[in-house]
Amino acid sequence: MAELLLGVNIDHIATLRNARGTAYPDPVQAAFIAEQAGADGITVHLREDRRHITDRDVRILRQTLDTRMNLEMAVTEEMLAIAVETKPHFCCLVPEKRQEVTTEGGLDVAGQREKMRDACKRLTDAGIQISLFIDADEEQIKAAAEVGAPFIEIHTGCYADAKTDAEQAQELVRIAKAATFAASLGLKVNAGHGLTYHNVKAIAAIPEMHELNIGHAIIGRAVMTGLKDAVAEMKRLMLEARG
């Protein structure tokens, strides 16, 4: 059974910061806290529209992280150039649409083999490990192995969004079979998208899983578990000012 790691995605710390155009909350500080709590790596998605994580965040995180930086990005010339210059430990190549709220599905590696092969070679030559974010589909897994990616990240969105227990169980079987197939080809298997405190255990139990990348659920839980202390501290400061 593979060692299981947690990559914490801090994109939505940046979402909250950017909503008001302030300097806080700082994703860099959030990354430090996540590492102290046991995160094995920090994941950030530098989108083309910079809707949350910024170039500044990527640069400082690369310089300050104690663990590993996983940079999610689209396969564009701009992003490849940034990755080669920044040299994160990992790059996870993802599909990207400007109008989407979050990544909606996996890469079509099979339909763009040359483009993906070129991107993988360029990143590998820069000393960066690569994963490809794909659906739990054998054709895509085979293509990922063929273009030179040592890792895949299985898109767990359909599992997370399942409306019934039966549908979720079916998706779980599909993911487990995909993980076994990928491992048989020599690929290391990560997974992510939509994983929460309620649905993570079944995915974590899949023996081939190497790392789970989880963000929104953790940030959402942090708001709730930290809200009591945050309100109490503000009230304390106000009363202290009045003597």
UniProtKB/Swiss-Prot annotation:
The name under which this protein is listed is Pyridoxine 5'-phosphate synthase
Record-level Gene Ontology MF annotations: pyridoxine 5'-phosphate synthase activity
Primary gene name: pdxJ
The entry assigns this protein to a family as follows: Belongs to the PNP synthase family.
Sorted alphabetically, the Gene Ontology cellular component annotations on this record are: cytosol
- Assembly description: Homooctamer; tetramer of dimers.
Report keywords, A-Z. Cytoplasm, Pyridoxine biosynthesis, Transferase
Native source organism of the sequence: Shigella sonnei (strain Ss046)
> Where is this protein primarily located?
cytoplasm
What CDD domains would the database entry show? PNPsynthase
BP terms from Gene Ontology = pyridoxine biosynthetic process
